[in-house]
């Protein structure tokens, strides 16, 4: 039932909350600062699952398993909508079974039809699953709707098209929604939609100067206002009145779920992250515990129900998309812990409750649990986090001090994988990101050496550049050529990104996400790198060893021979690590020299997801690895292929132990890659100590060292930014992975159940370094080739 939103409603909802500076203008940030309670205790207060929770879990798992066998249901006769699709339930015959309502579609795991990103793509997804869109709907959409994909390809330059065809610039969000935007969904819980709509209306009225920028902003605010009304309508489908603020922690969780699921009904971005939700919910929970409104068991049950809902989220994806983002990730990144500007840590009981879901409802890839790590966090929480990583290998860690030095504040959160955002920041830091996937820097370098001819398809000219004709490669000559190749690559990449984000705002503006953000926002534009380690190692080989080019009769380089030893990135050798820093600096400075859409700031990520496998299959030989080559019939031969390492990881051929890897990564300048420097590591429990307690304590010390400036490398300010932590022995999981059993691991930037990986991706995963010692100063590191 709709409630009249009066001052009395706010007095009732906010009773017991401190402070006034968050009441007159929406600011979850200020609300949290005034009201959160740091928790210094341990996990002993946590409750286990209820029978009801386990019943809901079983229904979800059984339904998903069934559809994985027979095929998932798809909408084929209706376009997705926030409020026009009926309410959905876990069990339509027992609606009271649920505690937290709101689902992505009207039926569990029914996949929404989302054509606004690209009608052809949406229809191709159906075709790949043996289905087709309703002919009448196709006719209406094809005649009346311009999709983002349509707009992008109307504007793409010939240089972009060549780069896409060569797979040097590929995988961009030009055929799928961009993602990486995080609404402050707790705003709905704290204020209700009516308050937020009135605030948007005031901001619309305040814009009086009519120019191109303000015309667009007024239209966007209007769309946000309409989206908030649709969120109210969505809540009403379940009998919920989200126009008013939440009265207790159950409603706060419920309101957040309605806001988030409204987003997931209409936006299928490559990452749909949740943001900094636990700390806000904890404030409601602490008030309810003090009042005796709910027990700890009840609050954990609400959290479990919410997380189970998040795990039902699924988008219809094309096969080409799955090659880049395998395992069907949704990147429901949930950020917790961290430090406040006043020196207080931000660990709360709710952080424990979210991590506890790995035990109560079982290990799973989603939500993407992310701990913002600082050495000053309570030891009990750090130890609990490490204990859960030791048990589950499904938590990622981000270094607070590294990100804070670059201006990311106390309510920053992680988007997608490793990318910091500060959604409510009023001091000019990034509120959102214009996502740009990544490009193949190694391929661009190899193509440049061949005079702009593709490194696999030698007859295909990608860009104009003088080739390097030396038989023995000279470092300075190669760097001059590489510098010009990077000019072409970054120019082309920026042009593509500006077009993509202009067209996305024009044809598929994410109004419902933007409605939960400040009206005036500042964006970064995320540019990524793939093939980083092999690029660095190739340049190191050219500089410190002897690299001979192998050419065909036309002078085309098809392979390389290396004589002598050379340092590799990841071995804690400044000779290689300085090259890594130089490559990042060159790349970032070239990007930053461009004018970007809506005056965004260029940021760089060393992150690949599973695209390192896809890019490997599109790249020829380099001085340090075997790539693909063409058979006589023109098909690609992958028989000798060595996969790229993921993200910022060193090559599998690097001789460093885990500590050497950490030191090399800590040297990288975050200012040159402040979209994230992703390290995915696998370490054997045996490398950490003899007993489980010793292993957990050592993990705490290692992460403290990696994330604390100067702690890992004395006399420096170097510190790391991100770690995907897997604590496991390869021999314990190898057979399970290859047989397609459930094995949850962290890969580059997210968590995946390995049964959903392709055979090639499983192969690449099991070929990664699994550290059996912490440092190669003691013993050799075990590679999987030794198994």
From Swiss-Prot:
UniProt record, GO biological process: glucose metabolic process
Gene Ontology MF: a single term: formate C-acetyltransferase activity
A Pfam family of this chain: Gly_radical
Keyword field: Acyltransferase, Carbohydrate metabolism, Cytoplasm, Glucose metabolism, Organic radical, Transferase
Subcellular location: Cytoplasm
Record domain Glycine radical: where: 645-774
Top-rank taxon, per record: Bacteria
N-terminal signal peptide: none
Active-site residues per Swiss-Prot or TrEMBL entry: 416-417
Residue ranges annotated for the PFL domain, each copy included: 8-629
Catalysis performed (reactions): formate + acetyl-CoA = pyruvate + CoA
Pathway: Fermentation; pyruvate fermentation; formate from pyruvate: step 1/1
EC annotation from Swiss-Prot or TrEMBL: 2.3.1.54
Cellular-component GO terms for this entry: cytosol
Modified residues (Glycine radical): 749
Family: Belongs to the glycyl radical enzyme (GRE) family. PFL subfamily.
PANTHER family reported in the protein's UniProt record: FORMATE ACETYLTRANSFERASE (PTHR30191:SF8)
Subunit record text: Homodimer.
Entries under NCBIfam families matching the protein: pyr_form_ly_1
Extra remark: Several mechanisms have been proposed based on complexes formed with substrate analogs. After activation by the glycine radical, the cysteine radical, Cys-417, can abstract hydrogen atoms from the other active site cysteine, Cys-416, and from coenzyme A, and it can also transfer hydrogen atoms to product radicals. The other active site cysteine can attack the central carbonyl of pyruvate and covalently bind the product acetyl group.
Protein name per UniProt: Formate acetyltransferase
Organism field: Lactococcus lactis subsp. lactis (strain IL1403) (Streptococcus lactis)
């Amino acid at each position: 039932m709709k409630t009249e939103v009066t001052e009395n409603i706010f007095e009732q909802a906010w009773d017991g909350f401190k402070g006034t500076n968050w009441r007159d203008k929406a600011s979850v940030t200020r609300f949290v600062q005034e009201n959160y309670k740091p928790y210094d205790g341990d996990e002993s207060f946590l409750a286990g699952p209820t029978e009801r929770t386990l019943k809901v879990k079983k229904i979800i798992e059984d339904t998903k398993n069934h559809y994985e066998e027979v095929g998932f249901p798809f909408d084929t006769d209706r376009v997705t909508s926030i409020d026009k699709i009926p309410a959905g339930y876990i069990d339509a015959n027992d609606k009271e079974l649920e505690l937290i309502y709101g689902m992505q579609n009207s039926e569990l795991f029914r996949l929404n039809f989302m054509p606004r990103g690209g009608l052809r793509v949406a229809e191709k997804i159906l075709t790949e699953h043996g289905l087709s869109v309703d002919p009448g709907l196709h006719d209406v959409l094809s005649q009346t709707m311009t999709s983002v994909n349509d707009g992008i390809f109307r504007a793409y330059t010939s240089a972009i098209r060549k780069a896409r065809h060569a797979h040097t610039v590929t995988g961009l969000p030009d055929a799928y929604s961009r993602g990486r935007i995080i609404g402050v969904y707790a705003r709905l819980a704290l204020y209700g939609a009516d308050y937020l709509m009135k605030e948007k209306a005031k901001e619309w009225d305040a814009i009086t100067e009519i120019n191109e920028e303000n015309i667009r902003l007024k239209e966007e605010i209007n769309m946000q206002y309409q989206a908030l009304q649709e969120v109210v309508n969505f809540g009403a489908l379940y009998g919920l009145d989200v126009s008013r603020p939440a009265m207790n922690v159950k409603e706060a969780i419920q309101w957040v779920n309605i806001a988030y699921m409204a987003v997931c009904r209409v936006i299928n971005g490559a990452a749909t992250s949740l943001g900094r939700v636990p700390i806000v919910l904890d404030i409601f929970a602490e008030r309810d515990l003090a009042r005796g409104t709910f027990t700890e068991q009840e609050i954990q049950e609400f959290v479990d129900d919410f997380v189970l809902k998040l795990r039902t989220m699924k988008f219809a994806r094309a096969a080409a998309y799955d090659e880049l983002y395998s395992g069907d990730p949704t990147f429901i990144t949930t950020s917790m812990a961290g430090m406040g500007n006043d020196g207080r840590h931000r660990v709360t009981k709710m952080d424990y409750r979210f991590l506890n879901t790995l035990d109560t409802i079982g290990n799973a890839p989603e939500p993407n649990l992310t701990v913002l790590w600082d050495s000053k966090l309570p030891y009990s929480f750090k130890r609990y986090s490490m204990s859960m990583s030791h048990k589950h290998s499904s938590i990622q860690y981000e270094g607070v001090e590294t990100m804070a030095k670059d201006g990311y504040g106390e309510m920053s959160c992680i988007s997608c994988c490793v990318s910091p955002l500060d959604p409510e920041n009023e001091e000019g830091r990034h509120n959102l990101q214009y996502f740009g996937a990544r490009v193949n820097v190694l391929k661009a370098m190899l193509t440049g050496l061949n005079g702009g001819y593709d490194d696999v398809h030698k007859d295909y000219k990608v860009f104009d550049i003088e080739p390097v004709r030396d038989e023995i490669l000279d470092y300075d000559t190669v760097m001059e050529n590489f510098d010009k190749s990077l000019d072409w690559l970054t120019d082309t990449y920026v042009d593509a990104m500006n077009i993509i984000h202009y067209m996305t705002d024009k044809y598929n503006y994410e109004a419902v996400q933007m409605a939960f953000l400040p009206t005036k926002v500042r964006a970064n534009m995320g540019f990524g790198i793939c093939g980083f380690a092999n690029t660095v190692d190739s340049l190191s080989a050219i500089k410190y060893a002897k690299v001979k080019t192998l050419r065909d009769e036309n002078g085309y380089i098809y392979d390389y021979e290396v004589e002598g030893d050379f340092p590799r990135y990841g071995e804690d050798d400044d000779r290689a690590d300085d090259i890594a820093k130089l490559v990042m600096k060159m790349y970032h400075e070239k990007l930053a020299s461009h004018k970007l859409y809506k005056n965004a700031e260029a940021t760089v990520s060393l992150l690949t997801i599973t695209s390192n496998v896809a890019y490997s299959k599109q790249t020829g030989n380099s001085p340090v690895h075997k790539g693909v080559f063409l058979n006589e019939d023109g098909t690609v031969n992958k028989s000798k292929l060595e996969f790229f390492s993921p993200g910022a990881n060193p090559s599998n051929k690097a001789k460093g132990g885990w500590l050497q890897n950490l030191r090399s990564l800590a040297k990288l300048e975050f200012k040159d890659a402040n979209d994230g420097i992703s390290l995915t590591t696998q370490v054997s429990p045996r490398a950490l100590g003899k007993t489980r307690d010793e292993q957990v304590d050592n993990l705490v010390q290692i992460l403290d060292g990696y994330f604390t400036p100067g702690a890992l490398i004395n006399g420096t300010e170097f510190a790391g930014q991100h770690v995907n932590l897997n604590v496991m022995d390869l021999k314990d999981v190898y057979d399970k992975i290859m047989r397609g059993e459930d094995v949850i691991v962290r890969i580059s930037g997210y968590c995946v159940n390995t049964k959903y990986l392709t055979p090639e991706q499983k192969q690449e995963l099991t070929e990664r370094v699994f550290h059996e010692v912490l440092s190669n100063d003691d013993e050799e590191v075990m590679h999987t080739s030794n198994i």
